[in-house]
């Protein structure tokens, strides 16, 4: 086993009273004011001189001048931590500029300097607390902010903070205007164990009808395993919310709607967008967790995934990218696999659906998601693509595979028992 130190985040929902809500808004507004003022100064310096100020001490030096009221409210430690957060953002901007000059970014990836904590002309409250400035009482479920001597009840169970050897880091408290709730996000440094044994290799192809197609190398029995995760529920969710959002858009475009009705409709509009996003993210999380568990069961140690680069630019629209958001799915898979000690590698997936994984010849697309090889065998198109990705990663292509199908939903992953006349691979 190899021990690797990583940073993870625990999210807690804060249970506030009107008094606590006023306190959080006051402190959060002051922190947002600091971030906006400092980013305005640095952005102006960047656009006028081309120089990038990424030092946290330049903001710290102004604590007794223009930032004194914020400094007095936040305290020395938390003010310094907010300055470090601003510095981290500008260091990231500098790194992206260097990557763009070296040609490491795609042409459509535009690099912009850090912006402002504002929405609809109002500051978005945010509270930043240093690692030693708070304490989490897991028994009483209280978040204690030391400088202000305030206890805030919370709900939820931290996943990473309770692990042995976990080290708490920066705390960020934010307000969700759609849900009208406060959330505390704890940065936690933990040590994960990564397996170094020679497990099986596997390939992953991401798609539309089949959200994930996963194929392993042949096991000791000489047979591989293919796992297919359907994208039907995800697509159904998208079209359901799209229809609901379109109805509200029609009502908003009606000039007869009164101002009060419009404010309510806009609130519903934002809630539907947020709910659709949450459903999608939860489907991704459930599918990734289930697949990681299957990898451990099948003794898979390394996984190769086909990277979908440029899809949103080459084939934009809801049919390809709007609902599936492949990059987020890929990042979710990478994080979940890392948590389970499984290595994930990205390789190009160009042409993997057009070539037979066994013979290397061009295949003919048939109805119902099948491809036909000139040598006579028929294979599921997504299984064939996953095999090609596995092959590109240096894995062995199985001659026969056992196919298992699953339906990932926002609540769980459902196994599908299908009776097939023959092996689709």
Question: Residue ranges of each PLM-predicted region?
Answer:
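Short amphipathic beta-strand/extended segments with alternating polar/hydrophobic composition
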Residues: 146-166, 195-199, 221-233, 379-383
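Acidic carboxylate diad motif detector
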Residues: 55-176
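Short polybasic amphipathic segments
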Residues: 134, 140-146, 211-218, 369-372
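Substrate-contacting helices/loops that form the catalytic groove of nucleic-acid
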Residues: 47-56, 60, 177-181, 185-202, ...
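Positively charged, low-complexity nucleic-acid-binding target-recognition regions
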Residues: 2-7, 191-192, 318, 324-425
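Gly/serine-rich nucleotide phosphate-binding loop at the start of the catalytic core
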Residues: 1-81
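Stable alpha-helical structural segments in soluble proteins, enriched in small hydrophobic residues
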Residues: 38, 81-93, 383-393
